[in-house]
């Protein structure tokens, strides 16, 4: 379930578009939260196994904990003018951050893990501080009943990932994509992980390629298979 599109809503029209699959319209923050809850339940019913948040491509992951009043003020401003769009990221941030926390509580209630993009960013999308997992420790502590998976082996910050997976019962490490990014890093990190972290919290393989539709937007099952071969070879060395 792709989370950013639901908590980074910037305009009246974006919000209404999220409610359209239910043939509903939205005028209040409560109505929007209810729409998202119904949609997320539907995702799970039809086979979704996790939430995924790749917000690191667009912002730093230092989510504040704004009040509902602050978030509702931004939301109501968008509702007051169908042509208005909130400035990003600063003007939108109270709503963005509030919704993110609300959706984590929904993930808890649906008993679905939350996958967070950490570490390397594809392309030139870059600032190191955007995707580093270590500053997220407060988030893992606040939402202790939510299961988090930290993606891409937090490359290149392996030590911090080991600490988070060992120190927080609700955090697991996931090597998806990492075997293609840096095989030697993965070998070294795995050696440390098997001696320092409970084995059930180490997911040694994953490939988060889209599997739906036709290329270029999806249909990448072959790439997931290829990544599996890389991971198998890499872990066998």
Label every model-predicted segment.
Residues 135-138, 143-237:
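H/E-rich (His + Asp/Glu) clusters that bind or coordinate divalent metals
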Residues 44-45, 108, 166, 198:
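Residue-level signal for alpha-helix termini/capping positions
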Residues 3, 120, 176-180:
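Short, acidic/turn-prone active-site loops that include or flank metal/cofactor-
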Residues 36, 96, 100, 186:
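Aromatic/hydrophobic pocket-lining residues that form the small-molecule binding cavity
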Residues 18-35, 93:
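Active-site mouth loops of central-metabolism enzymes
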Residues 33-42, 46:
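Short alpha-helical segments and helix-capping/turn motifs at coil-helix boundaries
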Residues 31, 46-160:
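Divalent metal-binding pocket/active-site signature
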Residues 1-23, 64-89, 225-228:
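Active-site gating loops and adjacent loop-to-helix segments of metal-dependent hydrolytic enzymes
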């Amino acid at each position: 379930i792709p989370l950013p599109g639901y908590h980074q809503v910037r305009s009246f029209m974006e919000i209404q578009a999220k409610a359209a699959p239910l043939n509903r319209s939205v005028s209040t923050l409560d109505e929007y939260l209810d729409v998202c809850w119904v949609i997320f339940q539907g995702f799970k019913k039809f086979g979704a196994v996790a939430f995924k948040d790749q917000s690191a491509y667009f912002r730093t992951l230092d989510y504040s904990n704004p009040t509902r009043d602050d978030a509702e003020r931004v939301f109501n401003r968008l509702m007051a003018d169908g042509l208005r769009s909130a400035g990003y990221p600063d003007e939108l941030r109270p709503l963005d951050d509030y919704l993110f926390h609300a959706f984590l509580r929904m993930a808890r209630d649906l008993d679905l893990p939350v996958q967070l993009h950490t570490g390397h960013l594809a392309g030139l999308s870059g600032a190191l501080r955007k995707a580093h997992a270590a500053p997220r420790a407060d988030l893992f502590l606040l939402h202790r009943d939510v299961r988090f998976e930290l993606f891409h082996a937090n490359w290149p910050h392996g030590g911090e990932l080991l600490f988070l997976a060992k120190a927080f019962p609700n955090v697991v490490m996931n090597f998806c994509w990492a075997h293609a990014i840096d095989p030697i890093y993965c070998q070294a990190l795995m050696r440390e992980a098997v001696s320092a972290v409970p084995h059930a919290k180490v997911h040694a393989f994953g490939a988060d390629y889209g599997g739906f539709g036709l290329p270029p937007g999806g249909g990448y099952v072959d790439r997931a298979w290829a990544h599996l071969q890389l991971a198998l070879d890499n872990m066998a060395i």
